[in-house]
C-alpha cells in the first residue's frame, strides 16, 4: 500500500491543511521547521527517549487478557496498557515530546485545552518537570464533571481557565486556547492534545503517539511470532488510535478498527460519532469530518466519556475512512458501561470510559474470530477519573 501522508502542505488527501489567520501562519510554519529539525537531531531523540523510559515508565506491557479471552471464546485478546503510563493515560507520550520542543524553541509558557482533564494533567505535569508556565482552558461543563483533575492541574502549578462559551466543552476550550495562543505567540507554545488543528499538529501528535503502535508490533511479534489479525482503539479526536494504527498502516493483513462514541445512539442527536454520521468541513484550522447541520453550524457532541465528545475527528482518520484502510464503528454509553464493568470484574483492570468503547467493540469482534488469531485493544487510560461519575450514573438508572 502506497501511503505517505501528510504531503508537504499538510494535507491527508483533501483533509488537514492550515486554515489559520495570518497572525498564526508564521508561528505554525516556525513550529513545523523546529519540529523537522528536532526529529533529525539525535540529542533531542535521546532526551525524549530518556523521559519516555525513566519518567513515563515505557515501554508499557502488552498483556494477555486470558479471562476475557475465555469469556468471548474467540480470538486471543491482548491489552496494550497505556493506562500504566505516568498520569494514567496515553496523553503524556505527546505532551512530553511537545514540551521538549517548546523548550528547544525558547518558549517560556505553554497553553493547552482539555476535555476529560487527562491532557490538561499530562500537560501540567511536563510543565512542572521542565519549568514551563502553564495555562489550561477547560469547558465549564467539563470542569464540573472532572473536579479532581482540575485540582490536580492546580496542584501541578497550572492556571485553569473555565470556558463558559458555547456548550462549555472541549470544542469551546480549543477555541479559547487558540485565541490565547494568537495573542501570546512570541513566548507561548500551544500543546494540541489530539491529532487535530492546523498542520503540523496532526503529524506531530501522531508521531509522538506512534510509540504505542511501534511497541505493540515488537511485543506482539515477540510473543506470537507474527502480527495481530486485528487492532482496536477508541476515537475522540483520535490520537491514541492514530498512535496505535500508524505503524500498522502498511501491514494490510492487520485489520484496524476505530471506535467512536454513539452516546444515546447514532439515530438520536446525542452522540459523538463523527465518522459514522458526520460530513466534511473545517474546524480549528483543519479540514475533517464534522458533526454539523445543513448551515455548517457545529453540532454538540455527546458521550458519557468527556474525552470523546469532540464534534470533529483528526484529518488522517478522515482519509483512512475514505480509503477503507480503517473500519470505523460506534459504541453507545450503555455498551461502554457494560464493557467497563466486565473488564474490571474479569481482569481486575479499571479502564477509562474512553477505552471502554474500544473494549466494548472488541467484545463483539473477538467471538467472530478464530482461536489462533489475535486481537489487540489499545487500553488508552485508566478509569480512576470516571469512577465517581459512573457511580452517579448507575444510581440514577
UniProtKB/Swiss-Prot annotation:
* Organism of derivation: Bacillus cereus (strain ATCC 14579 / DSM 31 / CCUG 7414 / JCM 2152 / NBRC 15305 / NCIMB 9373 / NCTC 2599 / NRRL B-3711)
Q: What is its EC number?
A: 4.2.1.20
| Gene3D superfamilies, per database record | 3.40.50.1100
Q: Which reaction does it catalyse?
A: (1S,2R)-1-C-(indol-3-yl)glycerol 3-phosphate + L-serine = D-glyceraldehyde 3-phosphate + L-tryptophan + H2O
- Explain the purpose of this protein: The beta subunit is responsible for the synthesis of L-tryptophan from indole and L-serine.
Task: State the Gene Ontology terms under molecular function.
Answer: tryptophan synthase activity
Its annotated pathway?
A: Amino-acid biosynthesis; L-tryptophan biosynthesis; L-tryptophan from chorismate: step 5/5
Query: What subunit structure does UniProt give?
Result: Tetramer of two alpha and two beta chains.
Cofactor(s) needed: pyridoxal 5'-phosphate
Q: Which InterPro entries match?
A: Trp_synth_b_CS, Trp_synth_beta, Trp_synth_beta/beta-like, TrpB-like_PALP, TrpB-like_PALP_sf
Q: Which PROSITE patterns match?
A: TRP_SYNTHASE_BETA
* Family to which this protein belongs: Belongs to the TrpB family.
Q: Work out whether the entry's keyword set contains Lyase.
A: yes
**Disulfide bonds listed in the record:** none
Report any one BP term from Gene Ontology.
L-tryptophan biosynthetic process
Spell out the protein name for this chain. Answer: Tryptophan synthase beta chain
Hydrolase as UniProt keyword: no
Instruction: Provide a GO CC annotation, any one.
Output: cytoplasm
- Which keywords fit this entry according to its UniProt record? Amino-acid biosynthesis, Aromatic amino acid biosynthesis, Lyase, Pyridoxal phosphate, Tryptophan biosynthesis
Question: What is the residue range of the signal peptide feature?
Answer: none
